[in-house]
From Swiss-Prot:
InterPro entries: KfrB. This is Protein TraB. Keywords: Plasmid. The gene is traB. Pfam families: KfrB. It comes from Escherichia coli.
Amino acid sequence: MNKVQIGAPRTSASPGVIMKPEGSVKIAVMNGSRQVDQVVNGEWLTMKVLPEAGLPKGIHQLSDAKDASKNVHPHKHVGQVLHDDGRNVYQFSEGGIVKHSRGIFEKPPVVGKNYEIAYSRGQGKVIGEVSQEQAAKAEQKRSRSI
């Protein structure tokens, strides 16, 4: 049996590690903080540690985010902003995590706040910030209509 050194970085060869492609980013929310990790040279490296910002606990893979602008049919997303990398904004939505172009935001979005973003013909527009209660109602309304 292989002995694992405590504190040693986990690589793709480590047991239980499923590696994402080079450059992939994940947000790990736990213990009151959110950690921005990226795959560099085949290893997950922590790039930043930030406050939790009211985000749900868990490991959230940004590489699995769906691009909201790819759907040409009118639709909207209501939920918390998970991450802003300067080019894209990642948001929790009904189907998981969605990615928006940073350019549709007039001012920088606040991580942890809820926003409503509407799309028509692939063009996004930020409707505005919504309360936690409004976001929960929108989620319930969507789940009933399915």
